[in-house]
Structures are given as structure tokens and as C-alpha cells.
């Protein structure tokens, strides 16, 4: 298993000007420190799996840009549709209808290009998601992580590809801290001071976990009796704070399933067993 060092950790040992010799000296000095932390180097297979997620993320951002441009151009002509997929489908139908006289010839020629690009992006996103699902079905650890509420196929696939060897973390707390789902510390003089979450880690994983936690919280609001812990937290803490707390718990649970095996069991089922 190969490990590397973070540039940020080596920087503290660099003396004055930066050059190859000074860099090598700093690396040699840093690697001998007993408290130095190392980064596990991802395999080519892991990198390929994560490229699927990154590419999908880029295409989704491009799709959002195209939709916003299409809505803005048509709104200039007084054509407005509802939010969501239904509204986008309505706008695409208007663009495709040659008999609709609300669109001038030049305007139609422009928005047809946007509509065609939007359709192409939808096809590409679908093909990538299909491949991610195939990888997920062939990965036993990913299927176990998916059993956690709020972590779907995308989340499980991304977590297991990013942290293929969970034993590099001492505990689920370390894993959650590595993702950046713990408070940032600014403590001194024996006085503990905690701030917002550190956000030091994989932004993609953190976003997937928080979005999944928000989905679970919405279900908890609709069915409070099924989620007593979340209901109590929501009664005394802001919604987004609870979402991050739940995302932290989801990350720790995912680490436990990857490190020790098994599938997720709801607290009441675990107590009954």
C-alpha cells in the first residue's frame, strides 16, 4: 500500500526559498516526524470510479447553466414556465413547436441549439449514472453502505471508492473529521472554542452526505414518530445544523459498515435483536 504526504504538512519544514534541494530536505525532515500524517494513494481503479462522479458533476452543472439560459431567453419574450422538470419540458415543447408564433425566427434558431444541447447532456448523464450503478452492484461494500438512510447509490459508490481501505482511520469519528463534518477548533489556554464545521476534506463527499441528510430530515418532519432523535434535535436546533449533525452520523455509520461488515439496522431493530 502506497502513502504520500500533503504539501500543506511539508510546507512547515521548508526553509526560506523554494527549490528542489530545499523541497527534498523538507520532505526528508517531515517524513521522520512521529506525528506526521500520510495520505493513502488511490489505485487506478479508484481514480477511474471517482472520475465517473466528477464527470457527472460537471455535466449536471452544465445542464443547470443551459436550463437557466433557456429560461432567461424565453422570459425576455414573455414565455415563462413553472419551476422543476415539468416547466423545462414545457419550454422544450414550445421551442420544438414551429407553429408557436411567440418565437421570432432568429430567437427560435438560438434556443433550438440550447434545447439540443440540453437533450445531449441528459443522455450523457444517464449513461454515466448507469455505469455508476453497474459498479455499485458489483461492489459488496457499496451495497452495504447504501442501506444507510440518506445514502443512495451515488453516495455509497463515492464513499467506497474514496475510502477503499477504512482501516486507515482509527474510528468513525476520524472518518467524519477527514470529510470535514466536525466543528473547527480555535482553543487556547485550556478553554475550548468550537466554530462552524471545518470543511477540510472531500467537498463532493461532504455535499452528498449533507444533501442525503436533508432528505431524511424532510421525511422526519412528515413522520416525526419514526425519527424521535431527529425530531428532538429539530425542536431545539436550526435545520441546517441538524442536517450536518446527521451527515456526521451517516459518515460514522458508513465507516463502521465498511470496517466491520454488516448492514444498517434501525435503532429499534438493533435493540430488539
Task: Show where each model-derived region lies.
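A detector of single, family-specific signature residues
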Residues: 1-273
Amino acid at each position: 500500500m502506497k502513502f504520500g504526504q500533503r504539501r500543506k504538512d511539508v510546507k512547515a519544514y521548508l526553509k526560506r526559498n523554494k527549490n528542489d534541494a530545499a523541497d527534498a530536505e523538507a520532505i526528508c525532515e517531515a517524513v521522520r516526524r512521529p506525528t506526521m500524517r500520510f495520505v493513502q494513494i488511490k489505485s487506478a481503479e479508484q481514480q477511474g470510479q471517482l472520475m465517473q462522479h466528477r464527470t457527472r458533476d460537471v455535466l449536471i452543472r452544465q445542464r443547470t447553466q443551459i436550463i437557466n439560459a433557456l429560461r432567461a431567453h424565453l422570459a425576455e419574450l414573455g414565455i415563462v414556465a413553472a419551476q422543476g422538470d415539468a416547466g423545462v419540458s414545457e419550454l422544450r415543447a414550445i421551442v420544438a413547436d414551429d407553429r408557436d408564433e411567440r418565437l421570432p425566427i432568429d430567437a427560435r434558431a438560438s434556443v433550438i441549439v440550447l434545447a439540443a444541447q440540453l437533450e445531449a447532456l441528459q443522455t450523457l448523464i444517464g449513461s454515466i449514472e448507469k455505469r455508476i450503478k453497474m459498479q455499485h452492484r458489483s461492489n459488496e461494500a457499496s451495497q452495504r453502505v447504501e442501506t444507510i438512510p440518506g445514502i443512495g447509490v451515488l453516495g455509497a459508490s463515492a464513499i467506497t471508492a474514496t475510502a477503499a481501505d477504512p482501516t486507515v482511520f482509527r474510528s468513525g469519528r476520524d472518518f467524519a473529521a477527514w470529510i470535514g463534518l466536525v466543528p473547527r477548533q480555535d482553543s487556547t489556554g485550556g478553554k475550548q472554542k468550537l466554530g462552524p464545521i471545518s470543511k477540510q476534506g472531500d467537498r463532493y463527499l461532504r455535499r452528498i452526505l449533507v444533501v442525503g441528510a436533508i432528505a431524511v430530515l424532510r421525511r422526519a418532519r412528515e413522520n416525526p414518530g419514526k425519527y424521535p432523535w431527529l425530531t428532538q434535535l429539530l425542536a431545539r436546533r436550526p435545520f441546517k445544523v441538524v442536517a450536518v449533525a446527521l451527515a456526521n452520523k451517516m459518515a460514522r455509520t458508513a465507516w463502521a459498515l465498511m470496517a466491520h461488515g454488516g448492514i444498517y439496522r434501525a435503532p429499534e431493530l438493533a435493540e430488539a435483536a
